[in-house]
Swiss-Prot record:
Keywords linked to the UniProt accession: ATP-binding, Cytoplasm, Glycolysis, Kinase, Nucleotide-binding, Transferase
EC number: 2.7.1.2
Gene for this chain: glk
GO biological process, one term: glycolytic process
Lineage of producing organism: Bacteria, Pseudomonadati, Pseudomonadota, Gammaproteobacteria, Lysobacterales
Cellular component GO terms held in the UniProt record: cytosol
Name of the protein described by the UniProt record: Glucokinase
InterPro entries: ATPase_NBD, Bacterial_glucokinase, Glucokinase
Keyword ATP-binding: yes
Amino acid sequence: MSANSQPVLVADIGGTNARFALADTSLDAPLLKESIREYAVAEFPSLGDAARHHLEQIGAAASRGVFAVAGRVDGDEARITNHPWVISRSRTAAMLGFDELHLINDFAAQAMAISLLQPEDVVQVGGAAWVPGKPGQPRNYAVIGPGTGLGVGGLILRHGRCYPLETEGGHVSFPPGTPEEIRILEILSEQFGRVSNERLICGPGLVNIHRAVCEMAGIDPGQLQPVDVTARALHGDPQAMRTVDVFCAVFGAIAGDLVLTQGAWDGVFLTGGLTPKMLDSLQHSGFRQRFEHKGRFSSIMARVPSLAVMHPHAGLLGAAAYAADAERDAPGVAA
């Protein structure tokens, strides 16, 4: 363990649930598995209350923390859309009696997790196989994940250090690539005005695509949830099956664009709550064809790995990696 003998409290705060764990940053696999818990955010008035409850539940103490939140971190505060908590770093640290507390974006944590992932933590989705870089080897990675929304980030590895890219790339404009997708854009524009990638590639995005597909077919889409769309697709419903096909193809196109934008030639990691659930669809769809279909760069894109992250606690793992990196920056710690 580091100079501080206590483990670090790490958290992954989403719109509905909050996950906590203790991490020993001196270990290659830093998460202390027996300490991992998940709580509904609605059960607690604040992040500090949830964190304190967790420490009480596991009978542990901590004086440092890294909390990843599903929103933009702006100075001392983090804001999550439609979330009951107003998250203040300083107030939360004071409430917990912490000497040090970092708030980071959830996809900064997902990106940092790449530095600790093992080959068994990922599943190849077409293309080249992933070979983790050797210590000190420069690497550029992208990360993208559909869940309640669409998270986008990246990771730059230089001289043994990790530099996460915090972005709001899920909100860039949706670029249709086929006549069908142009029509889907037109239909969604009638509802939303501007249409971002997140309007299609996330859980609610499945419903949006399904509604557009049904409108093109002259069929009432009904009032469905994302799980209803995927369930209907499994049972052979034509519109639901087409929805999943469009989702995977657009996801692939966007992931490929992200690689080009970030120069992430060493691979893109697919995370988020939907990726494990839709893994079979991603592997047997147009995802990879659209990922590679980049004109003069198609042959280069064919060599870029696309990898589904299957680690059950990647956000917590990334928060632990961030904590380890922060320790190396601490005064008196040799690089």
